Regions:
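Glyoxalase I/VOC metalloenzyme domain signal
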Residues: 1-5, 11-30, 46-185, 189-257
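Membrane-anchoring hydrophobic segments
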Residues: 36-38
């Protein structure tokens, strides 16, 4: 079963510039280190155990899953779920029709030299970014997640992830199979969209589809295809700040109401 959102992935052109901009927004940004596949990252950790991964490339890496998506622009591009049984949930997703790889080993070397190791099951093809990728730590999870959870802007965790989709029946089947419960129907007049919302641990994941051709989601689907669209954050104080969208590098982030 999914335990909650592990992290959201924001792909950017220049890691140092993006990390600096997120610091200007009041986030405590920690250097994550390098992956051996040509990418490096910076992390924004929250007290609920989730985090934002800001990722870029320090060398050309055309086989990387986020290399081609970055060519269409910086943005929120993918999401990872914690699971209490990686092999079982990978198998369940595959039985539901999700194109997902068997668990494979990944690693990252932190700036202090510590090598982190984990297993990932990666949704691929048209399911990338719609179905989550799944993670199981081989080294202690607390070594992977920074302990710097205090942010000047009051951010305390992920609230709701919104994923734009062209139809709902498949994701409804996936999540009901994994979670064993029905979603809540949702509608958003501003987005001119409707969808389904699943509670996953402390987080919400909503899949939204446009109901008019003028919906912002319709344009998103034309440009990027089904994929993460936006996310809200939880705040530790009553009057959360408004983010300067120019500093978010294409990621639609806001504090939930």
């Amino acid at each position: 079963m999914f335990k909650g959102i592990d992290h959201l992935v924001i792909v950017v052109d220049d890691l140092d510039r993006a990390a600096g901009d997120y610091r200007r927004l009041g986030f405590n940004v920690v250097s994550g280190g390098k992956h051996p596949v040509g990418s490096h990252n910076a992390l924004v950790a929250f007290e609920d155990g989730s985090y934002l991964e800001i990722i870029a490339f320090y060398q050309e890496s055309p086989d990387h899953r986020w290399w081609d998506p970055l060519k269409k622009g910086e943005r929120l591009v993918d999401y990872c779920m914690q699971t209490d049984d990686l092999a079982r949930d990978t198998g369940k997703l595959r039985e539901c029709g999700v194109t997902i790889n068997d668990p494979v080993p990944w690693s990252r070397i932190r700036p202090d030299g510590y090598e982190l190791e984990w297993l990932l099951s990666l949704a691929t093809g048209s399911h990338r970014g719609v179905a989550p990728f799944l993670i199981q730590d081989m080294t202690p999870r607390e070594e992977r997640i920074p302990r710097q959870w205090q942010h000047e802007n009051g951010a305390a965790g992920i609230g709701t992830l919104t994923v734009a989709v062209s139809e709902l029946s498949k994701v409804d089947h996936w999540y009901q199979t994994i979670m064993g419960k029905e979603p809540q129907p949702v509608a958003d007049d501003a987005l001119e969209a409707q969808g389904l919302c699943f509670a996953v641990g402390p987080h919400q994941v909503e899949f939204m589809t446009p109901v008019t051709p003028h919906s912002p989601l319709a344009d998103w689907l034309r440009r990027f295809g089904p994929s993460p669209y936006a996310a809200t954050l939880r705040a530790t104080r009553g009057e959360p700040v408004l983010f300067d969208q120019k500093l978010l590098h294409g990621a639609d982030l806001s504090f939930g109401i």
